[in-house]
Amino acid sequence: MINYKKRRKYQKNQLILKDLKGDEKGNMRNNRLLNHKLNKYIIPGIMMSLALQLGNIVDTIFVSNLISVDAMSAVTMSLPVETVVQLTGYCLGIGGSIAVGNMLGRRDKESASKLFSATFLVTLVVGMIFSLCAFPTAEPIARILVPGGSILTDYTRDYIRISMLGAPVIGIGLMMVNYLGVENHPELASIYLVLANVINLVLDYIFLRFTPLGITGASLSTVLGFLFAMFLFLFYVRSDKRNLHFVRLKVKDFVIIKEAIVTGIPMLVFMATSFVKALGLNTIIMNQIGEEGMAVFTVCDNVLLIVEMLTGGIIGVIPNVAGILFGEKDYVGIHVLCKKMLKYSYLVLAMVFIFVMTFTGQITILFGSDGGELGTQMVHALRIFIFCVVPYLWNKFIVSYYESIEETTIASFVTFLENAVALLPATFTGIYIWKKVDGIGINGIAAGFIATEIITVAATWIFRKIKHKNSTFYIVPDKNPGINLDFSIRSSMDETQNVHRKIIEFCRERGVSANKANLAAVCAEEMTVNIIKYGGKTSNWIDINLCLEEDLCRLRIRDNGIIFNPLEYKHDSEEFDIHGIELVKKISKSMDYIRAIDMNNTIISF
């Protein structure tokens, strides 16, 4: 005999349990739409990272083979100045783009445009100041970096002088590629950097092979590459996918730049510690080992740039996408994003690791090794050094992820350890100990890098546990706030009838009033019908989320169809007459739209 009283009590308890945990039956989003867009960002991201790092690697290879190994070392000795020159463009570009992503996720286009305009102007002005200082300061700076007045000092002076002159161009270029990623144009950002570095590659060969410019030509080709490729930004200016526009700013409006600075603190710390890292490592290696140690370190550092070049583009998708998802409180999407990026990154890293271990000798020859005793030392050091890339990639992921969810303290902590606090003592200790073993100490450089990355991973785990007790690595919840119905449908008319039914059933189970439930169901059905009719061939999946928070009912619809802003729609012809849009506007409390991650995102509240 069935005990109906117990059965009703069981059903009631199950309903309460679902309310606490989220709607398990309703959480049927398949994430195909988001995964499709992430795949679209990955290739441009890799190309952008490849192009960004390729300039440094190409300069090093050409300089070592067409001038000398000393000239190659001068490129590395110039890194502290290069870091300072790039500081404004990098920090305001990354910090600004993440902050703008959060603003766009909240549908605040006005503030986003103000921040974009302010960061552009500040980057340009700071770059011009560097240009004015180039001629009077290049010589004394070079003597500080390379004391003793050797040929290495002259090479360093010539290289940094051109870098400082080109600061406005480099700064604006670096700033814009970050904004293009969050502005639905990741492919344009990657094309810009690829083209800039193709130009750099061609000019490098011409200047070093056929002109007396010497190392000055290597630096000049980088600046000219960034400059000549800027015509591509005209495509962005004319794009109908833009959310950001240049606006006239009053003096008080520049206060908004603090948003970019606060969000970009991890990058600011990274650039500042990179300066300390470059200066500190150069000093330690030159004093403890000498120019041979500097040559070996330059090769190892360029291999790390290759790792950065291939995996950094994948990890670099996180700031472009996670900031917008975080602004929308789409925590499920953030989890999907991170797992996918980590999976792809470590697959690529495994291939790089095998390649370096297999072709170590050939790699060192590429960077000017003659295969003698110095070449042998390079091979041994590089085979030890490559083991640092496994924890290095994890630390890079941590920085990108935590700054995207506004956990800048943890991101800065990682950067501070990895680039200064742990690295310099570890490298000094590694050289000192290895010198006792073999009398040379070069392998100690590699050992110091491995120790640094492992220490950083462990220390960051402890720091996160102290700051966020009982939290998971992600810190954000694994479910979206409120009680959610989250599902996906194919972009097909056959699917639309299920939208109305699912929303009505969900609202009935949650005790939502019949009137509000019907409003939500009608709005969702009307919007999906319009998307399917007019979304174009690119529209294949539609994500629908209905969130209940206290007295608020919020409907979010996301699709990858053609650009369509329902807020700007007006009836203009019988051929293109979307009556449902007007109905939705009338029955909803508010309606917001944004084109983000190259998708239409519409939020309707009741």
What residues fall within each predicted segment?
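Transmembrane helical elements of multi-pass membrane transporters/channels
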Residues: 40-60, 162, 173, 196, ...
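Short runs within selected transmembrane alpha-helices of multi-pass transporters and secretion channels
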Residues: 93, 97, 162-182, 189-197, ...
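Helix-terminus/linker motif at the lipid-water interface of multi-pass membrane proteins
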Residues: 54-73, 142-150, 206-213, 272-302, ...
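Conserved ATP-binding N-box helix of the HATPase_c
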Residues: 514-539
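Short alpha-helical transmembrane segments in multi-pass integral membrane proteins
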Residues: 2-42, 100-166, 213-264, 322-388, ...
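Bergerat-fold GHKL ATPase/HATPase_c domain
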Residues: 466-521
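Small-residue-rich hydrophobic transmembrane alpha-helices
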Residues: 72-132, 173-182, 188-189, 296-354, ...
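Glycine-rich/acidic phosphate-handling loop/turn and adjacent ATP-lid/helix
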Residues: 553-581
